[in-house]
């Protein structure tokens, strides 16, 4: 069982944390791709719309009689055959979301955490004990934690000072431990997670992995 250093907000080592092999194991890139695809599909607004024959402006009156004019027969000026007529089979508002198995999602989350660990981009802090909600001060704190690009902050409970300190920092996002998604971990360069949040997340993922192995056996 591997371990990872636990540091304080000053970057000083204050302990270590044991990482479960069931969680921080092999990386399944195919599963990560599926999870990211599903997440982005859910984010798609799907508000695109074109005007069909029913919605486009114009009267429905027949332009000229069916026979006797020598011209091609025609119905409404809103016909798709006419300029400014309705669009046929054009995009309409819809949801792009689809069902994604929970087992796959948890497996992808394990792979995302394992990938961050393998890349040396996972930092565990004892706690996000932010004294004052100051963005500049917190930016220096992140620099001390070797965050030089984008960062995902994972906290176990509501932390108002942390929220206020990080919300205006470019490239920094704060999420709760029970709401973290593989997409979040892959999107940001470094993940900084509080020890209590990692404990809860690891226990949850470890339990799910053990249950899956029991079903297979």
Curated annotation (Swiss-Prot):
InterPro entries: Ribosomal_uL4 (IPR002136), Ribosomal_uL4-like (IPR013005), Ribosomal_uL4_dom_sf (IPR023574). GO terms for molecular function: rRNA binding; structural constituent of ribosome. It comes from the Bacteria. Disulfide bonds: none annotated. It holds the Pfam family Ribosomal_L4. Keywords: Ribonucleoprotein, Ribosomal protein, RNA-binding, rRNA-binding. One of the primary rRNA binding proteins, this protein initially binds near the 5'-end of the 23S rRNA. It is important during the early stages of 50S assembly. It makes multiple contacts with different domains of the 23S rRNA in the assembled 50S subunit and ribosome. NCBIfam families: rplD_bact (TIGR03953). This is Large ribosomal subunit protein uL4. It comes from Koribacter versatilis (strain Ellin345).
């Amino acid at each position: 069982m591997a371990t990872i250093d636990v540091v304080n907000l000053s970057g000083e080592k204050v302990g270590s944390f044991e990482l479960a092999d069931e969680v921080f194991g092999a990386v399944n890139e195919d599963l990560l791709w599926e999870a990211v695809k599903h997440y982005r599909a859910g984010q798609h607004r799907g508000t695109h719309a074109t005007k069909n024959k029913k919605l486009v402006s114009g009267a429905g009156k027949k332009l000229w009689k069916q026979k006797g004019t020598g011209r091609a027969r025609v119905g409404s000026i809103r016909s798709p055959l006419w300029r400014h007529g309705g669009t046929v089979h054009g995009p309409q508002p819809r949801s792009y979301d689809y069902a994604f198995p929970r087992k796959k999602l948890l497996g992808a989350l394990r792979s995302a955490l394992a990938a961050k660990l393998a890349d040396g981009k996972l930092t565990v802090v004892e706690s996000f004990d932010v004294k004052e909600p100051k963005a500049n001060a917190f930016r220096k704190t992140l620099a001390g934690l070797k965050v030089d690009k984008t960062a995902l902050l994972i906290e176990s409970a509501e932390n108002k000072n942390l929220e206020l300190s990080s919300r205006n920092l470019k490239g920094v996002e704060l999420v709760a431990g029970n709401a973290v998604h593989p997409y979040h971990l892959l999107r940001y360069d470094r993940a900084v997670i509080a020890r209590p949040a990692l404990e809860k997340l690891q226990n949850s993922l470890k339990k799910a992995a053990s249950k899956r192995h029991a079903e297979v056996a």
